[in-house]
UniProtKB/Swiss-Prot annotation:
GO cellular component, one term: ribonucleoprotein complex
Identification of the protein by name: Large ribosomal subunit protein uL5
SUPFAM superfamilies per UniProt: RL5-like
Keyword list, A-Z: Ribonucleoprotein, Ribosomal protein, RNA-binding, rRNA-binding, tRNA-binding
Organism lineage string: Bacteria, Pseudomonadati, Pseudomonadota, Gammaproteobacteria, Alteromonadales
Species annotation: Shewanella denitrificans (strain OS217 / ATCC BAA-1090 / DSM 15013)
Stretches assigned to coiled coil: none
Amino acid sequence: MAKLHDKYQETVVAELAKKFGYSSVMQVPRIEKITLNMGVGEAVADKKVMEHALRDMTAIAGQKPIVTVARKSVAGFKIREGYPIGCKVTLRGERMWEFLERLVDIAIPRIRDFRGLSAKAFDGRGNYAMGVREQIIFPEIDYDKIDKIRGMDIVITTSAKTDEEGHALLTAFNFPFKK
């Protein structure tokens, strides 16, 4: 089991139950899934770009990503319906906890000019979304083997009902929010 999952079960559940006055441990918010999304618009012109993006995403997530395709043709973007324009991975269970651990302990501290995560990125229902400008903050990516620096979106979906509960949950996992 991942360290963060053990920490969640041993200390975080009790802390949050006490703080928010839950009568049952099943009411305590938990992380349900983490979704990684990488938009690769350049893949329209060059198919190799998508292969590199898939390789990077596989290394970061530890599981094979799904290729996302354009739903509509847009002449301004030079894309047609069905063109591959990105990739995404949904992490649950053990892989999710391991990724969260790597994100908090290794990747976030490696972000250049980092001053803390914005506490305003909650969606109103306790889920948190953040963007990463460079995939090289993850230790699984070999700097010499990447063709281009790409960013990605990371969405942490929780069972929290409010942003306050979601913030308390992620703060308990040592997420470095701005004060």
